Amino acid sequence: MSQIFNFSSGPAMLPVEVLRRAEQELCNWRGLGTSVMEISHRSKEFIQVAEEAEKDFRDLLKIPSNYKVLFCHGGARGQFAAVPLNLLGQHGKADYVDGGYWAASAIKEAQKYCTPNVIDAKTTLNGLRAISPMNSWELSDDAAYVHFCPNETIDGIAIHETPDFGDKTVVADLSSTILSTPIDVSRYGVLYAGAQKNIGPAGLTLVVVREDLLGHARKELPSILDYTVLAENDSMFNTPPTFAWYLSGLVFKWLKEQGGVGELDKRNQAKADLLYGTIDSSDFYRNDVAVANRSRMNVPFQLADAALDKLFLEESFAAGLHALKGHRVVGGMRASIYNAMPLAGVKTLTDFMIDFERRHG
């Protein structure tokens, strides 16, 4: 079978080395004669998996010791509710930065629990979609926290600035960027990410929370979303998604073998440069996001003649380039190039794009 490159926005491509190891171990994990999916989450064997995964994740992100790491259910949408219910305390207000679809979704959920101060950061620059700089955001003095999403997967818009808001508690949805570039965890109060883009399969959510933010949950908060309950029970208040946890642990080890987040950051930049360079050098393709706010993970692009979209998708799929159809809100194409996507995959895509333009432009 020829090489297939999966450009899905999530669930996304996983490292082939990880998939092969999981395949080898699937029915007889560590010589136990059973699958890792079948053993108790409280067995010493799985506890070792869980502890190794947390240690590797901490090493990769350089997480300070005064932060808890939680392995949760519920995805980012679950965290849209968990964040306000855990952090608001007696506050009635939180700052929410609206940079696109997912930020707006977090705002909609937060409105059930508080009155968000919404900062609309969407703007245009020379006719291109952009995000206003952080120093222009009008934050509240009395907000419990400020929430933003650094990367909008649908719009292909990213906020590359590092937050510097003094002593404000900063919360970030890193679902599509986690482990793709180094970050200073100490700048944040809470980080959360669905696993299905840069970590592992769907079903697992990672939360990193500063310890001083624990213990302030609203009384109506379900225990399964309570950061304090999860921390006190080592993320095993109920049965966790064990197979997703195991596979994510394999991905963490793969990332360390590749050289860590710093090395992946270089690779991700090279992939993005190649793809955007191909788009920008052509009149046949276009990207409508200002250069300073272009996403390195999700690259939307349109053809000059939308009537060719269907043919582009058919021919690219036949060439082993899968899941390139853009989101219905934006249209066109979208290439998601997370950590597991090799440079060779992006090169295959750009070669196809150049050839398609030659034949149909």
Swiss-Prot record:
Cofactor: pyridoxal 5'-phosphate
Enzyme class name: transferase
Subunit organization: Homodimer.
Positions with a binding annotation for pyridoxal 5'-phosphate: 76-77, 102, 153, 173, 196, 238-239
GO cellular component: a single term: cytoplasm
Gene Ontology MF: a single term: O-phospho-L-serine:2-oxoglutarate aminotransferase activity
GO-annotated biological processes: L-serine biosynthetic process; pyridoxine biosynthetic process
PANTHER family registered for this protein in UniProt: PHOSPHOSERINE AMINOTRANSFERASE
Protein's job: Catalyzes the reversible conversion of 3-phosphohydroxypyruvate to phosphoserine and of 3-hydroxy-2-oxo-4-phosphonooxybutanoate to phosphohydroxythreonine.
Coiled-coil regions, chain positions: none
Localization annotation: Cytoplasm
Keywords: Amino-acid biosynthesis, Aminotransferase, Cytoplasm, Pyridoxal phosphate, Pyridoxine biosynthesis, Serine biosynthesis, Transferase
EC number of this enzyme: 2.6.1.52
Catalytic activity field: O-phospho-L-serine + 2-oxoglutarate = 3-phosphooxypyruvate + L-glutamate; 4-(phosphooxy)-L-threonine + 2-oxoglutarate = (R)-3-hydroxy-2-oxo-4-phosphooxybutanoate + L-glutamate
N6-(pyridoxal phosphate)lysine sites (modified residues): 197
The organism's taxonomic lineage, starting at the top: Bacteria, Pseudomonadati, Pseudomonadota, Gammaproteobacteria, Enterobacterales
Family assignment from sequence similarity: Belongs to the class-V pyridoxal-phosphate-dependent aminotransferase family. SerC subfamily.
Pathway named in the protein's UniProt entry: Amino-acid biosynthesis; L-serine biosynthesis; L-serine from 3-phospho-D-glycerate: step 2/3; Cofactor biosynthesis; pyridoxine 5'-phosphate biosynthesis; pyridoxine 5'-phosphate from D-erythrose 4-phosphate: step 3/5
Protein name (record): Phosphoserine aminotransferase
Pfam families assigned to the protein according to its UniProt record, in alphabetical order: Aminotran_5
Chain residues that bind L-glutamate: 9, 42
PROSITE patterns: AA_TRANSFER_CLASS_5 (PS00595)
Cofactor notes: Binds 1 pyridoxal phosphate per subunit.
Top-level lineage group: Bacteria
